[in-house]
């Protein structure tokens, strides 16, 4: 199965980039089928490369995947095609950029019914930055609602290509796939071969194998990698022995060596995927390269949330589950924390909201751990009056207001593509979320691209859902981090009968604090069950109460046994009840149901 090294001119390394749900993984299936890497009977289910249940269900690709195919072209030669399937979601854009760096070309897929969307443009820019040759492909042309010529015009405006350079296919029906294969062979250049240089290989993904440790997927940029070589990872500066190297078809195929230009895998008994970071460079220990490949960066989590087991006995199960998940996901970070209201749990850092949802769902589905999640928030920079600077990712550790000199929060630059009819709605949403409007450009007569700058905290919550609902599903968004800015933020505490519930604390902008406090108290009033005594729900900034709701006590009719009789007897019974309730209120703890934490997540509903 392996290729002789002399045939590097017949290698094509390419990836497929697209907005979510534009048919990327289905197209990958057709390519596997036409190259006979798999036949239909082996496929079983659609989307072969999306091998997590969650990936298939949500119709998204979460991890990057790599697979090698052999194709007999019309010119009579056999070509080796290395397809790298990339995630399409904004949370995983760093993974996408590293996958692109392992390729020479890209197929840009655009849905014939939807047209160019925000992440199509974001991924296109990533591909152009990586210097890739791009083949634009319009997919789903078999659907009755497809508008091939309209979408082609959008692509021409966006990329400046000629009409005959745009391919039209239907991945599901298998239309136009042969023409696409020929285009891959003729329009994507072969890799540059530098076999005589010191080894430099780019890691674009890693997965954890319970028996073999971390399996590293890499692209050999320069030099040769042989089985048994001692290798060094630049980021961790650790040394390992290459126990097994090879190529990926549907299974791992061991090889004795991988030459420059090839894509393959490396197994070298790595116990932790954090030692094999995406974007890092692998070199030889005895003949190392002087510098790493450019583009590597430490992935920083953008969204933080507390995860607590519903049943406190499951804390160890949660720890083990997070450890196992982190083996496969180097971007997940977690540290233990305790909460007065929720007990022991973990503070977790995620790339974005989708990443957070996926981790939660995998914890519940694959590991059977039931969890309560606190409100997601971002990391703030707090400058204190004594000159110190602290990073706060949890509202409960926010310093007191008197010690704070200034607070900074992260901002993102966002582009929203929508139909022109919804500009007004989106401007209104932008203003509500403290957005700073920049510009609007027309893509064609009906579609516009709007540019905003937002505080990340306003976006991570439910912005995407709101955007979809006000634009009847037509708008799409993409954002990138642009740095920290000074902001007037305060910590809003929730108190039940004077006791602060730390897990309900949030950090909000001062202009929104009153509105949040009011909504939150009203929401909690409807959720917290009645007690035998009165419960006061208060929202406070520091010692100042800004909103209050009261849950009245459940009352037993203590006068039921008094038929007529002396009023003082009745008064005595009522006084006794009042005393009992007062005593109860002093010792009683209000149980906060799980719905109260979920209420924070959809406060506007």
From Swiss-Prot:
Listed PROSITE patterns: G_TR_2 (PS51722)
Keyword Transport appears in the UniProt entry: no
Record-annotated tr-type G domain positions: 9-192
One GO MF term attached to the UniProt entry: GTPase activity
Source domain of life: Bacteria
Documented EC number(s): 3.6.5.n1
Group of enzyme by EC: hydrolase
GO cellular component: plasma membrane
Subcellular location(s) per record: Cell inner membrane
Membrane topology per record: Peripheral membrane protein
Annotated residues for binding of GTP: 21-26, 139-142
Substrates-to-products reaction catalysed: GTP + H2O = GDP + phosphate + H(+)
Gene Ontology terms: biological process: positive regulation of translation
Entry keyword Cell membrane: yes
Keywords: Cell inner membrane, Cell membrane, GTP-binding, Hydrolase, Membrane, Nucleotide-binding, Protein biosynthesis
Reported function: Required for accurate and efficient protein synthesis under certain stress conditions. May act as a fidelity factor of the translation reaction, by catalyzing a one-codon backward translocation of tRNAs on improperly translocated ribosomes. Back-translocation proceeds from a post-translocation (POST) complex to a pre-translocation (PRE) complex, thus giving elongation factor G a second chance to translocate the tRNAs correctly. Binds to ribosomes in a GTP-dependent manner.
HAMAP family: LepA (MF_00071)
NCBIfam families: lepA, small_GTP
Family, per entry: Belongs to the TRAFAC class translation factor GTPase superfamily. Classic translation factor GTPase family. LepA subfamily.
Protein's UniProt name: Elongation factor 4
Organism whose genome encodes this protein: Chlorobium chlorochromatii (strain CaD3)
């Amino acid at each position: 199965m392996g290729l002789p090294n002399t045939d590097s001119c017949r290698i094509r390394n390419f990836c497929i980039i697209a907005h979510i749900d534009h048919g990327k993984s289905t197209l990958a299936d057709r390519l596997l089928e036409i190259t006979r890497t798999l036949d239909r009977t082996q496929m079983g289910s659609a989307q072969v490369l999306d091998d997590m249940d969650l990936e298939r269900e949500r119709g998204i690709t979460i991890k990057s995947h790599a697979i090698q195919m052999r194709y007999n072209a019309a010119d009579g030669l056999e070509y080796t095609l290395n397809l790298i399937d990339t995630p399409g979601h904004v949370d995983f854009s760093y993974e996408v950029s590293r996958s692109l760096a392992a390729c020479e070309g890209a197929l840009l897929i655009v849905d014939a019914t939807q047209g160019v969307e925000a992440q199509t443009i974001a991924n296109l820019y990533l591909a152009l930055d990586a210097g890739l040759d791009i083949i634009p492909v319009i997919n789903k042309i078999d659907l009755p609602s497809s508008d091939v010529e309209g979408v082609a015009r959008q692509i021409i405006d966006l990329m400046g290509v000629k009409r005959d350079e745009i391919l039209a296919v239907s991945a599901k029906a298998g239309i136009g796939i042969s023409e696409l294969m020929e285009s891959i062979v003729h329009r994507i250049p072969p890799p540059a071969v530098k076999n005589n240089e010191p080894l430099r290989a780019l890691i674009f993904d890693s997965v954890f194998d319970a028996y073999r440790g971390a399996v590293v997927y890499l692209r050999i940029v320069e030099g040769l990698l042989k089985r048994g070589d001692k290798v060094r990872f630049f980021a961790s500066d650790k040394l390992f022995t290459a126990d097994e190297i090879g190529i990926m078809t549907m299974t791992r195929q061991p090889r004795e060596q991988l030459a420059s230009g090839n894509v393959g895998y490396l197994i070298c008994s790595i116990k932790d995927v954090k030692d094999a970071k995406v974007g890092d460079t692998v070199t030889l220990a005895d003949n190392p390269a002087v510098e790493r490949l450019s583009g590597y960066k430490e992935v920083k989590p953008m969204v933080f949330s507390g995860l607590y087991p519903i049943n406190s006995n499951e804390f160890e199960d949660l720890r083990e589950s997070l450890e196992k998940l982190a083996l496969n996901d180097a971007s997940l970070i977690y540290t233990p924390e305790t909460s007065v209201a929720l007990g022991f749990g973990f503070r977790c850092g995620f790339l974005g909201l989708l990443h957070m949802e996926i981790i939660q769902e995998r914890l519940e589905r694959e590991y059977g751990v039931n969890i309560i999640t606190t409100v997601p928030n971002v990391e703030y920079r707090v400058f204190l009056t004594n000159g110190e600077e602290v990073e706060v990712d949890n509202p409960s550790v926010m310093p007191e207001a008197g010690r704070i000199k200034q607070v900074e929060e992260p901002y993102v630059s966002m582009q929203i593509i929508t139909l022109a009819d919804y500009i007004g709605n989106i401007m209104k949403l932008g203003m509500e979320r403290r957005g700073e409007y920049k510009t609007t450009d027309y893509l064609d007569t009906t579609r516009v691209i709007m540019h905003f700058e937002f505080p990340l905290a306003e976006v991570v919550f439910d912005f995407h859902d709101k955007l979809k609902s006000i634009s009847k599903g037509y708008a799409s968004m993409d954002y990138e981090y642009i740095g920290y800015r000074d902001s007037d933020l305060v910590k809003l505490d929730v108190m039940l009968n004077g006791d602060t519930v730390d897990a309900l604390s949030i950090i909000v902008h001062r202009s929104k604090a009153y509105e949040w406090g009011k909504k939150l108290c009203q929401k909690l009033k409807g959720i917290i069950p009645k007690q035998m005594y009165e419960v006061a729900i208060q929202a406070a900034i520091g010692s100042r109460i800004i909103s209050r709701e009261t849950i009245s006590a459940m009352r037993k009719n203590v006068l039921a046994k008094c038929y007529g009789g002396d009023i003082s007897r009745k008064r005595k019974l009522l006084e006794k009840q009042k005393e009992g309730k007062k005593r109860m209120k002093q010792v009683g703890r209000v149980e906060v149901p799980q719905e109260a934490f979920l209420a924070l997540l959809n406060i506007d509903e």
